[in-house]
Amino acid sequence: APAKEPIPLSQKIAFGVGMLANQMFPAVLGIFMVILVEGLGMSPLLWSLIFFIPKLIDAITDPLMGYISDHTVSRWGKRRPYVFIGAIISGLSFVMMWQLDPNNSIMHNFYYFLAWSCIFWIGMTIFSVPYVAMGYEMSSDFHERTRLMAVAQWIGQWAWVLAPWLWILLYDPNWFESAAEGARFLSLWVGGICMVLALVPAIFCHSNSGAVGEGVHQDNSSLADTLRDFGRGIVITLSNKPFQKICIATFFIFNAFQTIAAFSWFIIVYYMNGGDTAQAGAWPTLFGSVMSLCTCFLVIPVVNGMAQRY
């Protein structure tokens, strides 16, 4: 049974380091994505497809990854191997995704980026689904799990504090001749560092999924049996009323957040400053960074305190 004693602070920090990678990838991706329109001349339609298609695949692979992880039996447990593999795939594919050349045609860059983006989000699925499940298995105590997630979210939120400062590097001619060149170079650092951070929970965190795994291992099950079992699990999960409420809340919160995050740069630069990036200055950076600092020092402590009390 999962341990009821408090999770050691070192384990909470190790888990939180993984959350930093889990948040840093999309935080930097949201900043770099502007380059596809600004620096490489992609149309809004192509830009929308680059957002839509990988996330559509992500929506399909997420529950599938959960099923695979739950049914895995290994000496390393049923979460850590996938966290390890997903971290490597995500880091390497993030680097490859941004090796774009403005001299290539727009459609060449579109298909190149789309292909690597799909691989990246599959890697993120392999990493993030077992990673989050690992966190909930580190303790059976509700309040201890809440404290773990508060620590992890606090550490992870710093991704949104730090990432906006890449705006300044990307558009400073003293650093890079163009934003596209800046993305090619900075992706090496972001992908490499985030890959290392994502490997930390796979190596140092100890969930209670069992040393040899506690997945339901069915040697003689056919593909049809497996698909039926998977479908039955989806139906049972979706019929759960509390889960439905969580899904609805998550849908609206994430859509609101992602919409603002994706369009904030365009609003600040084009609506408020007439398309002049020099005039916009550090405002795109400050907008994202200050909001995230408020989340770190106001929202997360308050929500964690309320969860402990109520």
Specify the residue positions occupied by each region the protein language model found:
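Membrane-embedded alpha-helical bundles of multi-pass transporters/translocases
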Residues: 1-310
